[in-house]
């Protein structure tokens, strides 16, 4: 309460405690008794942008078009006029983004880790072009953003702010010059690895090679700090996480990861790393991938991948994904739920702190999703579930977007401070034997 006796108000003009109290004693999901929370969440998201850290729609459109001789990447799915509640080829379209309250989206310009050298660079450029083309196709609903101020302005105009993130250091082909060019083209973060090691950093899902970052990898992080590109530590090994935290002068991000103490999967973040986010200022954005949020689903994933390897296949083999699909048909995996995601978010909050968490669903980057979060319309349900557990409006605003917007601003401040430093000219062979 304020000194005048009125309830303490948030910046959006609603009582901070409204969301935390409205849902207590709710009837089960699907009944009208739960709509008070949903309505309050939707009201909040109209005034405050929800920023999702990772969506793979650009690659999904590319993959769909490769299998359809009559369509292009921009025509293969009806992104602009998708119908809510019907089965579509993607988890994401513009009507569902609107229904999900997304105010800003980091579109992944992912390319597969089996691409290397110039092939990886050129495909990354095609992905950047695909995002730009999507935005140009729907100027009344999308606009490219680069800064936190851009996000707030675009959201206030009723459109979705569109940012880009590269997923894997293979996209720069060991070239600091290519890194700088990606930043010039609007890429705001780079995940240091994807599922495989790069020459200068270890991945969470590959055999240990370096033990973390090499000397050149440390220079990559330093150059990212200098140019204002966020260092994304999703997908990297625990050693790489720790080395990057030690090297980075700007806050780091995990754009789509969970808590390893909740689900023991190498893609998730150990508690000692989460504990260091407060001093670094960074953010861990909770993912929704079933095998990262549910232990039974994680164990099933290990089992089917072991079975594929026993059959003589590797992730780069043409038969890898068909084998996994057949295995899942014959041995259905456990079903993850929104409650699993809530458990991760609450653990991230407990260890890293309320100022160091966010959301990164990984929609269109995984074939299945938890019950209740099947597509991008699920965010209001998730936030309402947290409100039902006592989260205040301030808490939800931080999770939804305030924390990652603060990190963007901090990265830009660091880049301003470092702007007088010359760009690094090192070649990898000069630093790494």
Describe each PLM feature range.
Residues 19, 24, 28-210, 260, ...:
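N-terminal hydrophobic targeting/anchoring segments and the immediately downstream early-domain regions
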Residues 251-257:
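Short hydrophobic/aromatic-enriched beta-strand-loop microsegments
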Residues 6-7, 14:
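Compositionally biased, intrinsically disordered low-complexity segments enriched in Pro/Arg/Gln/His
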Residues 220-233, 239-240, 271-279, 347:
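Substrate-binding cleft of carbohydrate-active enzyme catalytic domains
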Residues 2-3, 10:
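Alpha-helix boundary/capping motif
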Residues 227, 234-239, 287, 396, ...:
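Glycoside hydrolase catalytic-domain context in secreted enzymes
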Residues 211-219:
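Active-site glycine-rich loop that binds ribose-phosphate moieties when present
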Residues 244-249:
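Short, surface-exposed basic-aromatic patches at helix termini and helix-loop junctions that form
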